[in-house]
Amino acid sequence: MNTRMMFARAVAGAAMVLLTNCAWGASSADWFPVSVGLTMARPIPPFPCDNVAGLSLCLLSGEDCPVYGLQASCLSGCAESIYGVQIGAGYQCADDVYGLQIGGANVTTNLRGVQVGGLNAMRGYGLQVGAWNIVDETSFAVQIGVMNSHFWKMDASQSSARSLQVGIANRADGGSRLQIGGFNLSDDGSCFQIGLLNFHNGWITPLLGWSSK
């Protein structure tokens, strides 16, 4: 799946979730269509910071609860899960993100979608666009940025991860990957590199590098 299609599907999915769940949330006793607060601990009546199906708006920081729709914050947003869009000027975090995450720094332990920001860190499947992109464990990722990192805590030879990295500096350990950039580093696993200098399994080569290990 190419980058444009992945991004388009994430945005379309976020919009669909936002539209369909607003009406559902309004009619549910356990969910609220709108949530407004200064922080997660200081909601503004009559808009509780609780389970949200629609719009979650916090002036300082978002609340730690599930959000189906849009969560927007001036500084930072935190949520148990996001099904839609999470956006803010500062730090954005969520356990699960199914959709789009936009912020100065974005962190999630389970991504199915897109991250756009200065710093992006995730586990899961998706696209990262930012200055520094970080992926952990057996993720399937497309990383576009100044610096891209793909790390493994497990035995790299047993990793099933796949990644495409496009940036000035790219690093990946284990799995299989395609690296395109100025400087590419690959410690283990199979790789194909296109760049000014390519470091792979103890070798240093200009322009092209590859390994089937």
Give the residues covered by each predicted segment.
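Bacterial N-terminal signal peptides that target proteins for export
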Residues: N2-A12
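Low-complexity intrinsically disordered segments
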Residues: N2-T3, V17, S160
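Bacterial N-terminal signal peptides
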Residues: A10-N21
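Surface-exposed, glycine- and small/polar-enriched segments that build interaction surfaces at terminal
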Residues: G25-K213
